[in-house]
Amino acid sequence: MAALTVGALGLGAVAVEGASAANPTGSAAGVPLTAGSLYNVVDQIGARSLWTQGHTGQGVNVAIIDTGVSPAAALSGADKVVAMVDLSGESGDPATRFLDTYGHGTHMAGIIAGRDPGANPALAAAHPEWFLGVAPGAGIVSVKVAGRNGAVDVSQVIAGIDWVVQHAAQLNIRVLNLSYGTDSTQPYTIDPLAFAVERAWKAGIVVVTAVGNDGKAARELSMPARDPYVIAVSAAEQKNKKWKVPAWASSGDTVRSPDLAAPGASIVSLRTPGSFADVEHPEGFVSPTLFKGSGSSQAAAVVSGAAAVLLSARPTLTPDQVKRLLTATANGKAITPRAVKFSGSGLLDVAKAATTATPQATQNWPMSTGLGSLEASRGSAHLLINGTVLQGEVTILGTPWNGASWAGASWAGASWAGASWAGASWAGASWAGASWAGASWAGASWAGASWAGASW
């Protein structure tokens, strides 16, 4: 496992055919509009009306713990990808450090905050050829935890959340997107991953999670969506102008169901040429710069963008208030069947949330102690590292996991699992010099991906 690598940078424009400040024909130029085009998604959730009022997510940074981000015009500019950290097994290789070799993280980043150079959100209704995410004014903090095949250990995700909490004030991180989940075999009240997301929530960060795509018979959300503090998002699919529960959607139970639903079927976002998803799923190809994917991952990214837009309009809202507004104003009649176990309070309506009075909202669920088993938190998702399965109470760093010691530590300056993240140096990097053709993927040997994508 490579040592932690951190980078902070203002990215210059990346030359991509079909999009430039001088000629904003856009990433989506010539691409037919579908229900999953972000041009339509922003209307489906009411975000465009907020854009015209100047609320585009500006002043809000969204952390994405995922597979990194790749060079794209819609993610260029000094105020777009404001920082990157690499906690993955690829961090030691300059050819892959920070970069998205799987294709998932870039797709999420585009949905949340992508923006073609020169595109003005206030005028975007007349320009369907522009690519704009839900919160085009927001910034992205990319925390890479997985490499070429998307596999990641739960201890890496916990470390990523730890890093986000430690740097939230410095980087103005108000939202955390976690399109990841495990089939943990223990209650959230002791699960270490649940403890981690609750600490982020209590630190003032709106945590948005994907519920999973295990089918309607699953009857249990993934972890950490199972934790009642966070915003658990399921996907909705538009067919013949009517919203349906996708066949692959996970179902909640009598204890915990999704909080709300958002568009999540065939969502068109940024493509990472040569990535695992791009190579293995050619059916997802839309254009040289765009790719489509389905899942609660995409739906969670839509809600993360909506949360950023809402916070740009009302920056004093707490995470509990953001959750209450988004769930209380969701359209409960939009999706059929109308079962709460599939779609929670209904389809996201951020425009209505933005105009609803600030609620008195304080969640008082039992909190996680984090004292449970790291192995149980993994569930069935295990990494294979150099031919050995990572299992038991051992972290990705090979150090023993002590839940009592970790849960009682002060995150502000404490070391995590024997490695000091706070002492890591920040280094500049230039995407323009990244070489994709020369990268070697043959050495990848991880298995057990848990990203909540139903299909590409």
Regions found by a protein language model. Name each.
Residues 1-21:
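Secretory targeting and sorting signals
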Residues 14-61, 71-77, 242-247, 402, ...:
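Protease zymogen maturation seam
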Residues 21-24, 38, 49-85, 91-155, ...:
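Subtilisin-like serine protease catalytic core
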Residues 66, 85, 225-308, 312, ...:
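Extracellular S/T/G-rich loop segment that most often corresponds to the catalytic His/Ser-adjacent loop
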Residues 189-207:
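Catalytic-core regions built around general acid/base machinery
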Residues 213-229:
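Glycine-rich, charge-decorated loop segments at or immediately adjacent to ligand/cofactor-binding or catalytic sites
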